[in-house]
Amino acid sequence: MTDQVQLDENKLIAERRGKLDHIRQACKANGHPNDFRRDSLAADLQSEFGEKTKEELEELNHIVAIAGRVMAKRGPFLLIQEVSGKIQAYASKDVQKELKEKYQGLDIGDIIGVKGALHKSGKGDLYVNMEEFVLLTKALRPLPEKFHGLTDQEMRYRQRYVDLIVNEDSRTAFIIRSKVVSAIRNFMVDKGFMEVETPMMHVIPGGASARPFVTHHNALDVDMYLRVAPELYLKRLVVGGFERVFEINRNFRNEGLSPRHNPEFTMMEFYMAYADYNDLMDLTEAMLSQVAISVLGSDKMPYGEYTVDFGGKYARLSMLDAIKMYNPEHAEIQALTYDGVQDRDLMVSIAKSVHVEVESFWTCGQLLEEIFGETAEPKLMQPTFITEYPADISPLARRNDNNAFITDRFEFFIGGREVANGFSELNDAQDQDERFKAQVSAKESGDDEAMFYDADYITALEHGLPPTAGQGIGIDRLVMLFTNTHTIRDVILFPSMRPQA
């Protein structure tokens, strides 16, 4: 914002404060009345009366009470915006005179209540004839388009309230988000899942490979961690006999910001006993198709230059096969087998050849995943399940019966990014104990995203976890697809931001 723009804005703010002082003195009140009640929304009026003729409305003389924010002034008409949409109000010359005397006129951004008969203009637009009116809230700051428009992306996120006022696309995105969450919840309940809530603060962080946020509980005098995932608590509930559970809630990971990452994000995580990861993939196909149709009216939606198709069966590829598919000219990759994947020197060589910066503590499985992420993941635009994840990067997943190097795990990709992660759960307490210990060793070697050892979870497994499959779905990333947006900040109301200087 230039110095001149700032001066102009400060001048307008001072003028509006002066108007509010005038209102307070004239009304002998605080200038913020709270006794107006609206009885109609713009969308409902359009639905009920939009097809009626001008003459029919005049004959009806239907009186309505509306309220909202003044977004434009066009001669005697005010454009009023509220949660359902916009509608015009007509101010006669007498009303305009009264507005001037009582409020020194209305400004863009003011919130008003209006009562009067519903009419239709010559152009066919509904409007309310202002017979009674009240200024409910004086807007002291002008809306941004008065000066330069809300074009600063950072300002959109820092002042989301302003973004929502002036940007219809933003409002629509968050309405879609709400509908997506509701549709998922309804789907899960219909499938016999029970919604639960598990702790947000953990004594031992677990359930995902991620760096946690640390806090301190004063009364207990103990460090605690904001949860990185609810997984271990949800599986404790399955041990306890709740065979189908789900939770939609926040996770926290003390990691960087990117178009795909926010330290605080929403996950839907669920577990079902007597099922495996194949059942999860089938359930995911049914869920996303139903949610898309429920929210958007179609199981096909635009995403960038693509059309994402949520209908039917989705592609299923092993991680190794996906790497081979998207590296057809790379001889070493084309010749790679699972025996070769376990040759660390070979994997380091291949990783470097595809421009992966290798960390010294990475395992063979991590190297395979990084090669996949560099060469294949960005190309998975249509819904795709990637399977056969190595055991050394899947510490909570069940080993494959035919190949102990891999697990019965998948990650689900759309639009070139991971949206979900699921697997047949490891319910062998002894194997889980050994994998936790391997994670502790990895942490000691410098991997700060490796998991902690959770002795109580081992105790829970020793009581017996039935054959179980579980999955987490990133709500924010899923909503990015439904809203055709390409940064996670556009679908989180108040994303994390660096402090302003």
Swiss-Prot record:
GO terms for cellular component: cytosol. Binds 3 Mg(2+) ions per subunit. One of its GO terms (biological process) is lysyl-tRNA aminoacylation. Its main location: cytoplasm. Signal peptide: none annotated. Mg(2+) 1 binds at residues 411, 418. Keywords: Aminoacyl-tRNA synthetase, ATP-binding, Cytoplasm, Ligase, Magnesium, Metal-binding, Nucleotide-binding, Protein biosynthesis. It catalyses: tRNA(Lys) + L-lysine + ATP = L-lysyl-tRNA(Lys) + AMP + diphosphate. GO terms for molecular function: ATP binding; lysine-tRNA ligase activity; magnesium ion binding; tRNA binding. It comes from the Bacteria. It is found in: Cytoplasm. Its cofactor is Mg(2+). InterPro entries: Aa-tRNA-synt_II, aa-tRNA-synth_II, aa-tRNA-synth_II/BPL/LPL, Lys-tRNA-ligase_II, Lys-tRNA-ligase_II_N, Lys-tRNA-synth_II_C, NA-bd_OB-fold, NA-bd_OB_tRNA. The keyword Cytoplasm applies. It is an enzyme of class 6 (ligase). Its EC number is 6.1.1.6. Mg(2+) 2 binds at residue 418. Pfam families: tRNA-synt_2, tRNA_anti-codon. Homodimer. Belongs to the class-II aminoacyl-tRNA synthetase family. This is Lysine--tRNA ligase. It comes from Aliivibrio salmonicida (strain LFI1238) (Vibrio salmonicida (strain LFI1238)).
